Amino acid sequence: GGTEKMANRTYEYNPTGGSPVINVTAGAELKTAVAVLLTKDGAKIPEAGKEATGIVLLGDETVAKGDDITVQIRNQGMWAAGAKIEAGDFLAVDAEGLCQKATTGQYILAMALTPATAKGDIVNVAIIHAGYEA
């Protein structure tokens, strides 16, 4: 028989490794491909232009409060557009959690890799957490 020792497991902190996604609880009803902010009450839509943690992975159309969701926090992902977007635009969150071109004072969560012609289009983005637009 094998000996299974769980007590000696070591966890190494590696800031460049690990997964580009995190599993969290929805703190409100959410649509997929929207940006969320982690709060003590779960993942919620941030205030427009404010800091966001990541983007809910594409899946079911809506997520109920208390559901487990997967949130992408870096690398390339897909974010639903709130307006027309050009490739290369720096993107911030709008009041619905959709992406919009960042304006002065807004938190840049991502950069658009593909354009969007209308609200609801899915934009391929690079999640960059670039801080606030100057």
Region annotations inferred by a language model:
Residues 2-134:
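Surface-exposed, low-hydrophobicity beta-strand/loop segments enriched in small/polar/acidic residues
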